[in-house]
């Protein structure tokens, strides 16, 4: 199974979405990473869409 790069982010980290590709209304949202799926997508309290650590711009807060 291929390991996907989560850029060091882990469950429990507080993050801010700086830029989510194709979803500008998520930019600036803050939340906690609640799970990471098998594809390396980050799911959390910022809303219904997953963050892709290798595509979207996020930062720890």
Name the predicted role of every residue range.
Residues 6, 10-61:
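Basic/aromatic-rich interaction segments and small domains that mediate binding to polyanionic partners
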């Amino acid at each position: 199974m291929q390991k996907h790069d989560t850029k060091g982010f882990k469950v429990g980290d507080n993050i801010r979405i700086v830029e989510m590709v194709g979803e500008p209304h998520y930019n600036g949202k803050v939340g906690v990473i609640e799970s990471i799926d098998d594809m390396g997508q980050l799911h959390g309290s910022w809303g219904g869409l997953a963050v892709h650590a290798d595509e979207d711009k996020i930062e720890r807060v």
